[in-house]
Amino acid sequence: MEIDYYDYEKLLEKAYEELPENVKHHKSRFEVPGALVTIEGNKTIIENFKDIAEALNRDPQHLLKFLLREIATAGTLEGKRVVLQGRFTPYLIANKLKKYIKEYVICPVCGSPDTKIIKRDRFYFLKCEACGAETPIQHL
């Protein structure tokens, strides 16, 4: 069976019209601000923590909980920044943020960053707003 090229174009246009507005006009590039890390004595401060959480479209508490578990330390959210107990390199913080993005932000099906975390019964899912896929994720 041969598919007519013009029928394909019409179907493609129709599919595009069905997409949600936030998907049609999203930025082609996903940009997250780099962590501004300062070390003061035995504390590490991420100055722009809230900005990072907003760029990822995630609750700062969720991101903080992940970060604290990953680097096995205590920390607090103070306004727009986070204060961590201990000295941690900017490289380590950046790697942990990349891991968070891979596990809790980017859709594993289509690669879109337009996702949200939803809870159904006792389980958590990463729901993609671009392709509609729901992927189970580990609860923090």
Swiss-Prot record:
Top-level taxon of the source organism: Archaea
Keyword Thylakoid: no
UniProt keywords, alphabetically: Initiation factor, Protein biosynthesis
Metal-binding is among the record's keywords: no
Pfam families: eIF-5_eIF-2B
GO molecular function, one term: translation initiation factor activity
SMART domains: eIF2B_5
Record-linked HAMAP family: eIF_2_beta (MF_00232)
Subunit field text: Heterotrimer composed of an alpha, a beta and a gamma chain.
Family to which the UniProt record says this protein belongs: Belongs to the eIF-2-beta/eIF-5 family.
Chain's role: eIF-2 functions in the early steps of protein synthesis by forming a ternary complex with GTP and initiator tRNA.
The protein's name: Translation initiation factor 2 subunit beta
Organism for this UniProt entry: Pyrococcus horikoshii (strain ATCC 700860 / DSM 12428 / JCM 9974 / NBRC 100139 / OT-3)
Primary gene name: eif2b
